[in-house]
């Protein structure tokens, strides 16, 4: 079953009704849905460089028109790095590593121990949008989520 661009936009915007969402999730994906999804995302950004692959909400692999390089870019237009590097190393990072910082998010007795877990929050340097969160042990290196096979 093929869905209209309007229905897919409702999905992207979080406005789709539950019945349609259930049907979408439980049936095979139609062939043109990903292309329509990219078109919708492209319409939501202010820059013209084509989106190659969305990495998450407000984070994309794009092809810069100026030099045709594939870059990881935020919705605000910040180019973090080439697509095959870890963009998190170029983001603004907040590390919650004290009990007081953990208690900003969790009730006191439910907060993780900062000796065993920290919370790393990655932000866009331009807009301040929260792009990702990880909760590793304090000594663990920055996690490189994945490198897509798109060459």
State where each predicted segment sits.
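N-terminal pre-domain and mature-chain start segments
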Residues: 1-119, 123-151
């Amino acid at each position: 079953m093929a869905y209209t661009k309007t229905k897919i936009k409702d999905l992207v915007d979080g406005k789709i009704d539950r019945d349609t969402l259930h049907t979408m999730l439980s049936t095979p994906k139609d062939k043109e849905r990903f292309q329509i999804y990219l078109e919708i995302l492209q319409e939501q950004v202010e820059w013209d460089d084509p989106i190659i692959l969305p990495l998450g909400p407000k984070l994309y692999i794009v092809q810069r028109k100026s030099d045709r390089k594939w870059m990881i870019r935020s919705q605000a237009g910040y180019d973090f790095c080439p697509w095959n590097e870890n963009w998190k190393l170029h983001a603004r990072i907040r590390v919650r590593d004290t009990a007081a910082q953990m208690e900003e998010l969790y009730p006191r007795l439910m907060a993780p121990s900062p000796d065993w877990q920290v919370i790393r929050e990655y932000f866009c340097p331009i807009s301040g949008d929260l792009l990702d969160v990880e909760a590793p042990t304090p000594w663990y290196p920055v996690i490189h989520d994945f490198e897509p096979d798109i060459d």
